[in-house]
Amino acid sequence: MILVCCATSVFARHTRIYGYVTDSDNRGIELVNVFARCEQQEGTSTNRNGFYELMIECQDTVQLEFSMLGYATVRQRLIRPNEVVNINVELTTETEWLQEVEVRGIQHQTGTLDQIDASAARVMPDATGGSIESILITFAGVNQNNELSSQYNVRGGSFDENEVYVNGIEVHRPLLIRSGQQEGLSFVNPEMVQNVQFSAGGFDAKYGDKMASVLDIEYKQPDRFEASLSASLLGANLYVGHGDSTYSQMHGIRYKTSQYMLGGLSTAGNYQPNFVDYQTYLTWQVGRQKTKDRFAQRQKTNPWTMSFLGNFSMNDYRFRPDSLSESFGGQNARSLNIWYEGQEKDRFLTGFAALSARGKVSREVELGFDLSGFYTHEQENFDITGEYVLSAGGEDSEQSNTHTAEVDPAAGQSQVLGTGIFHQHARNLLRAGVITLAHHGEWTHGRNRLRWGVSGQAELIRDHISEWQWRDSAGYSLPQAGPAMELYYSMRGDSAMQSARVQGYVQNTYRWLTDHGQVSLTVGGRLQWWSWNNEVLPSPRASVVWFPGWKHDFSFRLATGLYYQAPFYKELRDTLTDALGITRIRLNRDLRAQRSVHVVLGGDYYFRAWGRPFKLTAEAYYKYIDRMESYSVDNVRVRYSGKNDSEGYATGLDLKLYGELVPGVDSWISFSAMRARQRLMANGEGLKGEWIPSPQEQRYAFSMLFQDYLPQLPQLRFHLKMLFQDGMPYYAPRNNQSWGRMPMYKRIDLGASYAFNRKTARFMRAESAKHVKQWTIQFEVFNLVGWKNVNSYFWVSDAYNQQWASPNYLTGRRFNLKVTVDLQ
């Protein structure tokens, strides 16, 4: 309350003017120039929804002017305005529109790609420290069940079925990551992002051979100095950008430590995670002379632009577990207590570099060339022993954190169902390198937009894996089959792969007007060849978008195509088990790409409510997958069978309501319903078993991202992220036909931020703060309600050889304080 009162007194002499600029059809107009004149002059422009906001210091009359090419200028006078003034303006056209031109307040979706506001990642509460993925998981059809990870699954697909592009270049992730605790920073640095687009299915042929989704990110090119520095309990970020009319540069350094977050896990111990990331993006426009007249430069044919994108990341994870005490089972309660010895040491080093050249050779033709390389060196080492006691009794873990064992009144002791010792061991080393040379182009002529591309890729991977687990008992808790002690689990292998890929695509978009509205048709195809199995993959794709003439506030789209999930190294690892129970890895040269037929039908409805723009999106989809490769999921590790041994399908409905619940700030709610099933094949001949849930099936999901502020105090904002998702299926060890379902994943993250700038805080006008654009202080509460979410299970057996699944819980309630300084 004291802070609010003080802040109010600071900006009491200023007037905040805000509102919407619309056309005669009540649609917001983007890029309208808004000027306010009094003792000083302030200016701004409207956003894509027609919203504007400015602050001006004035004691008397304010002159307002709204202007845009093609519209009549509107002027208004405010005499001694209040501290907060809302003015909505309607502009009328003063010229005759060409038939082909449409002006819309909210950009209409002309395909399956949806826009994402990257700026929200700076202020949204996020347990990973701030990432684009933290916004993405609130979209319809996108799910995540681990707040420590930036990985996500889309419409029943696995983590590996999602493709990520930065400036048109595909980026890769480390391969050995098995848990969210090991996972470091997302590749994408939100401070460097200009534009983000996402498709949950039915995407165009220009995007690669993945079956689930595409995340397409474009980095910005600053034309002046800008910088930011932020620090919190989860790490620190430093960003610097600079540029002019001929060059630009950006540098970002991020440090993340999740030690504080990991303190809320079920397993007590000494966590030492440290993650560092450096990223740079440099551009240089060849042949352009320096000038301050950027408008004059834009009138000329664009010169060739050279760019370099570089990234280096180091994930260092050390863990020394101490103990675990957990209750589970509800009415048939059980208690599990484990005492650990040993430690885990993991290190993941990843480097990425891309050199690009892009230029217009004519007014209609644009060409581009890319040379990129990716290298990863991953080590995973642990030796951990544990002694466990499984007891009857204990309180339901959903109701209490207190762990007790049932006491036998006659014996006066707990009813111990099983005791034992286990030892987990791993010495895994993987080195992988990928080099890609690509060309792409675009030809725009009339109503046609033709795109094409071709690339060659070389892959070299060496992998050594040695991991096993054995379990012993006191002679009764695990039934003995003989004098020899068999390993509970073992996997060994030394593999090397050297391969080449060639792929290309061509697609054309044709737009035309009919008596029934505007139509946009995109038709294209991809072709890929891989030297490992000599497989050729043809992938035809098509989509059509219709803007009906009878109602400009609607649009409808249909997309379909044949999609392939071309295997990479992880999918190739087939296994053979010998008589001693040791599983050995071999690379399967007969493995074929998974194949999927997609059909996506969707539509958008644009409307205004309470004087503000809204958009309702609905998409129904169906995917049938054959030549499917079954897999299991443990935490975030995906382990494939190495065989085309199953088939499956996914179908569902996604709904999203997007709009401005308060002026100038985006919010949305999403709902998804789906069904994803699979069934195993017997040696590729005939069907075996029944349809069972796919490992990533979540039958329903509700999410919300909400932002709010006080009209009299717009610099104080509140941010809410809410997730309610169906639990993931899980399967008993060595029996993938016996399955259950985890409890619902539910989570509420809340944040509040306060921004200080020259217009709202007197101390920001001091000479010493002239290079400071804004200070932002943010307080966050993760998992506000303190729900205990399950991520995976630890399986133990009692004396009767009955298996029990002890849940591994994720983080509880945590608090975070973050300070951000923006420089200019």
Provide a role label for each language-model segment:
Residues 22, 32-37, 65-72, 81-125, ...:
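Short, acidic, small-residue-rich periplasmic hinge/interaction motif at the N-terminus
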Residues 39-51:
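Short, acidic Ser/Thr/Gly-rich low-complexity loop/linker segments typical of extracellular
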Residues 46, 432-434, 455, 492-615, ...:
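Structural signature of Gram-negative outer-membrane beta-barrels, strongest in the C-terminal barrel
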Residues 72, 85, 107-162, 166-203, ...:
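Periplasmic N-terminal accessory/gating domains of Gram-negative outer-membrane beta-barrel systems
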Residues 228, 232-255, 268-320, 343-369, ...:
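Transmembrane beta-barrel wall of Gram-negative outer-membrane proteins
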Residues 368-372, 379, 590-649, 777-782, ...:
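Membrane-embedded beta-barrel scaffold of Gram-negative outer-membrane proteins
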Residues 511-517, 621-624, 643-730, 820:
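Gram-negative outer-membrane beta-barrel transporters
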Residues 723-731, 754-824:
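C-terminal beta-signal and adjacent terminal beta-strands/loops
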